[in-house]
Amino acid sequence: MSKKIKVGIVGATGYTGVELLRLLAAHPDVEVAAVTSRSEAGTAVADYFPSLRGVYGLAFQTPDEAGLEQCDIVFFATPNGIAMKDAPRLIEQGVRVIDLSADFRIWDIPTWEHWYGMPHAAPGLVSQAVYGLSELNREAVAQARLVANPGCYPTCVSLPLVPLLRQCRLKPGMPLIADCKSGVSGAGRKGNVGSLLCEVGDNFKAYGIAGHRHLPEIRQTIAGLQDGIAEGFVFTPHLAPMIRGMHATVYLHLSDGICPETILRDYYRDSLFVDILPAGSTPETRSVRGANLCRISIQQAAQSDVWVVLSVIDNLVKGAAGQAVQNMNIMFGLKETHGLGAIPLLP
């Protein structure tokens, strides 16, 4: 395209922010015009992120000084509670917004306020937001002014379930269990004891068993596709001793006489970022590292009526920044692969 899309990134000093900068640097149709950070205002992006030396000549600015209203689209890579305060003004000025936080993911306001522990600052805007699971809501994303980018766990769990739920192939009243593992980068860049090398290295643990914020998000997707399933959904996340990557093992009960692998292959036949592996395969997190990919396999457990789904993504790419860029491409009628052609890193 002749005129490049002007992009702004709010909160660009975190892991999703730098991942957006990395991906957009390879995008042929965009110009990153503004990057904001209140704490690092005045600091050159290349000084703060040495990996971007020679790539960007920008410096961080405060949101008030960055001229975000002159952008065509703004990404919010901010903590929960920021976008719902700042996005409405930009949308009123004709700027399209993709929010990578959870501010607009949950449609039911009391549910959101319960899980996120604060009053919602823009409840009237929630109904206008499109949930940006690209492979589920592509047509709605294309028309959206505001996209709520999904969380990493919801992306990894939902992508293998969507084709089966759309055909109502899960057995109602039976448990649906997602056993998930995430790299430490999912906790963000702010320092905390739980993310220290001495805490996570050579260690493995579950967390959020009493309730994780992504639970209502996943249940919302399930409930919107098939009745009688979301109530039996159980989700247990784990922290794995790796920097990036996410693995979901999902146990489910399916209708008799179907071939779920065929259902998944048919649904994702034209999807560029979902790879359905042959039955018996075991996708690895390293097979998607650095790429906007989800690799999935499904097979029946031995001597059981339980089916086992394996799903892997890079939590920072398909689980965050990559899916956000994919949604931007859809919104502006671009090829979905633009900026997202990176091959997974190995080793």
Swiss-Prot record:
Protein's UniProt keywords contain Secreted: no
Pathway as given in its UniProt record: Amino-acid biosynthesis; L-arginine biosynthesis; N(2)-acetyl-L-ornithine from L-glutamate: step 3/4
Catalytic residues, chain numbering: C152
Transmembrane intervals: none
Record GO cellular component, one term: cytoplasm
EC number: 1.2.1.38
Catalytic reaction(s) noted: N-acetyl-L-glutamate 5-semialdehyde + phosphate + NADP(+) = N-acetyl-L-glutamyl 5-phosphate + NADPH + H(+)
One GO term (biological process): L-arginine biosynthetic process
Keywords, in A-Z order: Amino-acid biosynthesis, Arginine biosynthesis, Cytoplasm, NADP, Oxidoreductase
One Gene Ontology molecular-function label: NADP+ binding
HAMAP family on file: ArgC_type1 (MF_00150)
Biological role: Catalyzes the NADPH-dependent reduction of N-acetyl-5-glutamyl phosphate to yield N-acetyl-L-glutamate 5-semialdehyde.
Family: Belongs to the NAGSA dehydrogenase family. Type 1 subfamily.
Protein name: N-acetyl-gamma-glutamyl-phosphate reductase
